[in-house]
């Protein structure tokens, strides 16, 4: 909502409701975006879909020789995909219509490497048609990824013949599936089935898009409309110019640092798109649900992409059923809740609606209300604060604007924006708020702003805000100043425990919010108990908590699992008539394993005696494994912590029960577990393997009679 001009006070000249012709409009600073790029900026956050034969073969880059019959998404439901994306607040979707393997997700007239050659849906399936209809039904836009690299097509690498082939496929996609808003060109250029590389005819490809879908932006490393961000983590540079010296950048460039930050003296408007995947890899693979990015990681990625002037393209691949997994659907829904709870209400604009904001500035262009500092409270780019071209800077400050607040406002994020239809100008800025003593205190600073710049500033409560422009390529202008307060969280301490006696648990949140909790694993509601002091946990249970404030329940859940051990949970010691012999038995294996489950049923090559956990006994440095077996002499009754640090995987068992799970391919990672043991001997088994590369194993413990965590000594090991 715009404030009336009466609320905007300026030092000089006075604001007046002048006719628009009294003061020249702010002149554009070239280069500026064209309309299709402005429309792209408004899309902000959308989905990437990698789907095809790779979904069924568990590879990232197919070789082009896949049998189309492997493509069998028997439960495919594009409407389910789109609805999941919509819950996250996404505006559209880009799908890999053709990846490097050359397989087409639509029935193409110029290849048999496509959905029509699969028995899926009797050879009548068309993924693009399904997705186009789903997007139209749910109000999302559609974009397509079409790889010019084709590892299947025989004419790839022959020049014009392949260009004709690719343009035909591009035309099929652009003319058969309704409006296409983005065309995504991958820069990969490898060898085809004939061992040759193709020199892509980019001008022809671009002209084809312009002919059939003139409103679509074209993405590649070099644009021409949108550029890659230079990494696959979707992390933007602290400095991010939407402008680029485009003629210096080619598709497949190694200038990733330049792509990440852009060029301050760019010749063309080519903003950055930031892409990453919600799970490991671009295509779905079984068993990787634990690798799905957390809410915190997704939110930080959003801030590092959208909050640094780009758009966020998040890959969510369908599984081999043709569905978005339940794990991903739930994560997207939770992300949508957090985004809405964080950015759905601007604290500054809400106060302004009641007339509670008074704006002033170092200068207002022509003294006209249409350029007043109050205009930034409407986040649209068509209303903005601007200064005169000849505005004299005050020391290091090129221009400043302030907003006095009638009542205190609490926030932890500040977002700024420029009217990018007139170019990108700001080079340096800082944000200040009024402290309790009435003085301005800096809370954040940055370089570029562009279409959006978000700053995380820690929780602040203030009655005044000030933005200073410290450097600008031309007369500065701001179209947005927004204040947001992220939803409250609950801190649980300790965050889970295994204990032999009751645990006192502290639940805390920020002032102004209350914590409600349950002890039966159910979701806390407004009727759940309020945590007004420590919560006593005297049995094994799952504690769940959630913060509530004036906006309702926070979208951030908190959970901790406690195991309070009873008499039946203690492991009794093994009694020996004859004392065991010091040391362990080491069973040695060979094999190209990826998990320790592959050890089961295998016979060792040999068995040796070992004084401890010595992986130097392995028969070779790679593709090897060892199982150490014996007994551990526990000095006292108590709760013990066991840990392994290993490269690659390891597991530790006590009396046949798994205590430490550290399996899989990884570097030197540490995992730990706890168990209650009676004094005496306990059966011990430690498994370890190495696939390739570095190798290592450490086995440690802590507890009564041991003290802080140390390596298990040789004198505690027996066989």
Where are each of the predicted segments found?
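Aromatic-lined ligand-binding clefts that engage carbohydrates, nucleic acids, or primary amines
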Residues: 97, 507-509, 632-634, 638-652, ...
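Short beta-strands within extracellular/lumenal beta-sheet-rich domains
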Residues: 392-407, 621-632, 670-673
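Beta-sandwich interaction modules
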Residues: 443-475, 670-675
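Short beta-strand-plus-loop segments that form exposed binding edges in beta-rich domains
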Residues: 468-474, 685-693
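Short, compositionally stereotyped local motifs that mark structural "simplifiers"
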Residues: 485-582, 606-609, 613-618, 625-627, ...
């Amino acid at each position: 909502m715009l404030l009336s001009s009466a609320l905007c006070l300026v030092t000089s000249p006075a604001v007046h409701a002048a006719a628009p012709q009294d003061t020249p409009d702010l002149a554009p600073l070239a280069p500026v975006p064209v309309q299709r790029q402005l429309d792209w900026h408004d899309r902000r956050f959308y989905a990437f879909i990698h789907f095809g034969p790779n979904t069924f073969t568990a590879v990232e880059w197919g070789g082009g020789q896949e049998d189309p019959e492997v493509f069998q998404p028997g439960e495919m439901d594009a409407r389910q995909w789109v609805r999941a994306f919509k819950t996250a607040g996404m505006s559209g979707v880009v799908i890999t219509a053709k990846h490097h393997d050359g397989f087409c997700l639509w029935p193409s007239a110029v290849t048999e490497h496509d959905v029509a050659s699969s028995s899926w849906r009797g050879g009548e399936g068309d993924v693009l048609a399904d997705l186009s209809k789903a997007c139209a039904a749910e109000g999302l836009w559609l974009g397509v990824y079409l790889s010019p690299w084709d590892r299947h097509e025989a004419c790839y690498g022959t020049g014009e013949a392949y260009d004709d082939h690719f343009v035909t496929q591009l035309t099929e996609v652009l003319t058969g599936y309704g409006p296409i808003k983005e065309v995504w060109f991958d820069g990969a250029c490898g060898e085809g089935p004939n061992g040759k590389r193709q020199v892509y005819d980019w001008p022809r490809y671009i002209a084809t898009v312009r002919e059939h879908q003139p409103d679509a932006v074209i993405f590649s490393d070099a644009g021409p409309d949108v550029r890659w961000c230079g990494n696959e983590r979707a992390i933007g540079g602290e400095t991010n110019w939407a402008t680029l010296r485009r003629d210096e950048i080619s598709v497949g460039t190694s200038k990733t640092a330049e792509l990440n930050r852009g060029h301050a003296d760019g010749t063309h408007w080519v903003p950055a798109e930031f892409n990453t995947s919600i799970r490991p890899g671009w295509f779905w693979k079984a068993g990787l649900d634990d690798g799905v990015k957390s809410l915190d990681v997704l939110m930080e990625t959003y801030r590092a992409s959208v909050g640094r002037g780009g758009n966020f393209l998040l890959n969510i691949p369908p599984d081999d059923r043709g569905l978005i997994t339940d794990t991903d659907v739930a994560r997207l829904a939770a992300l949508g809740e957090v985004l809405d709870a964080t950015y759905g209400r601007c604290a500054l604009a809400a106060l302004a609606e009641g007339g509670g904001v008074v704006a002033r500035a170092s200068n207002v262009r022509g003294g006209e209300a249409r350029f007043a500092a109050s205009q930034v409270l409407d986040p649209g780019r068509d209303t903005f604060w601007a200064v005169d071209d000849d505005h004299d800077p005050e020391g290091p400050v090129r221009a400043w604007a302030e907003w006095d607040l009638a009542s205190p406002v609490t926030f932890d994020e500040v977002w700024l924006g420029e009217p990018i239809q007139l170019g990108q100008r700001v080079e340096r800025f800082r944000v200040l708020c009024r402290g309790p003593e009435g003085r301005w205190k800096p809370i954040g600073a940055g370089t570029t702003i562009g279409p959006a710049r978000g700053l995380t500033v820690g929780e602040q409560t203030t009655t005044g805000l000030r933005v200073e422009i410290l450097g600008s390529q031309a007369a500065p202008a701001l179209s947005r100043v927004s204040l947001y307060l992220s939803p409250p969280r609950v801190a649980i301490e300790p965050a889970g425990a295994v204990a032999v006696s009751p645990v006192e648990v502290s639940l805390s949140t920020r002032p102004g919010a209350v914590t409600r909790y349950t002890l039966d694993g159910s979701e806390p509601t407004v009727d759940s108990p309020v945590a007004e002091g420590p919560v006593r946990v005297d049995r094994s249970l799952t504690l769940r908590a959630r913060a509530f404030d004036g906006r309702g329940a926070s979208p951030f859940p908190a959970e901790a699992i406690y195991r309070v051990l009873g008499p039946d949970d203690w492991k009794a010691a093994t009694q020996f008539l004859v004392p065991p012999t010091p040391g362990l038995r080491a069973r040695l294996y060979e094999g190209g394993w990826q998990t320790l489950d592959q050890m089961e049923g295998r016979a060792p090559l040999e068995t040796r005696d070992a004084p401890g956990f010595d992986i130097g006994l392995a028969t070779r440095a790679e593709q090897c494994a060892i199982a150490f077996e014996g007994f551990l002499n526990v000095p006292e009754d108590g709760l013990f912590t066991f840990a392994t640090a290993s490269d690659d995987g390891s597991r530790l068992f006590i009396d046949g029960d798994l205590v430490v799970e550290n399996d899989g391919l990884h570097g030197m990672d540490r995992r730990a577990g706890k168990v209650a043991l009676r004094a005496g001997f306990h059966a011990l088994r430690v498994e370890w393997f190495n696939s390739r590369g570095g190798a290592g194993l450490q086995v440690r413990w802590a507890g009564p009679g041991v003290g802080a965590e140390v390596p298990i000594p040789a004198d505690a090991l027996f066989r």
